[in-house]
Amino acid sequence: MHDQMLMTLHIRFSRSHGAHPALDGAAASCCLRTSTTTVNMSLTIQSQNKVFEGVLTKYSFRSKVLGGLEAKMNVFLPESANAGHKVPVLYFLSGLTCTEDNAAQKGHFFEAAAKEQLAIVFPDTSPRGANIPGEEDSWDFGTGAGFYVNATKEPWNKYYNMYDHVLKEIPQLIASEQIPIDVSRASIFGHSMGGHGALVMYLREQAHFRSVSAFAPICHPTNCETGKKLFEGYLAGGIDDGKQYDAAVLLSKLESSRQVDVLVDCGLNDNFYKQKQLQPESLVEAGKKSGIDTARIQVRLHDGYDHSCTSIANEL
């Protein structure tokens, strides 16, 4: 039977269940555990919280893709997850200046995820501690602003490979560490810069993801100041190379027979929308250009809503 993935917690997906053996005891406890525990020599548990009868665990690990730096992620597992039953997963990508904690603490996802018995994985937004000159000089470049690309410009290319970190390294780590998540049944969503990353990964790697949703995403980064700055900083070919990480460009070049499931929500009171940094309408225009069924590209604009996490909560 074909599984239709629940994306942004509203597109339903038939599911199987599963859970990390190390979490079984924590699932029965409401307390936060802050002592570190090493799991199979690769993952270290930094903390655990019970939430909606499931467990939110913060892990740290050494990332080969990010140049050997320590990386962190949060993983929510619903109550039904256990060693014998794996659950499908949503990857949530956060925006500029965020960490792995922002959406986990403010996104309001867990009640719906628990109801649907879905795992959610929250990666970080960039490497941390690379100590590259200029890395901390700007809020929209460097630390907290990895832009979900694989950098090709030195010295960034040693560390700033968030595309492979999310797409390859984290799913491989989940599988190797026997966290009870079925990585073959995955969808992806995100906010702002993370919405950009989610759209790009879905459009480039549809074999990995069933659907994509994005809140206030940067949809056409080669045509906005934020995207141009990041592409010129990370990519040897600058904006021209950035086209491979531009959702509108990717959509415009898809085969007309390609089946997509794209949902975008954006507030009309979002200052970034007003400044033409987001350009969600470009996705529909790109779909028309490629001949794709644009009914499967939903762009919903909401009067009065802004760029904040409260707007994300409204769309759930």
Predicted regions and their residues:
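Local alpha-helix boundary/kink/capping signal
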Residues: 25-27, 32, 84, 223
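Methionine residue identity
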Residues: 1, 5-7
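N-terminal targeting or regulatory segments adjacent to alpha/beta-hydrolase or S9 domains
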Residues: 8-23, 30-58
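Intrinsically disordered, low-complexity regulatory regions of eukaryotic regulatory proteins
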Residues: 1, 22-23, 268
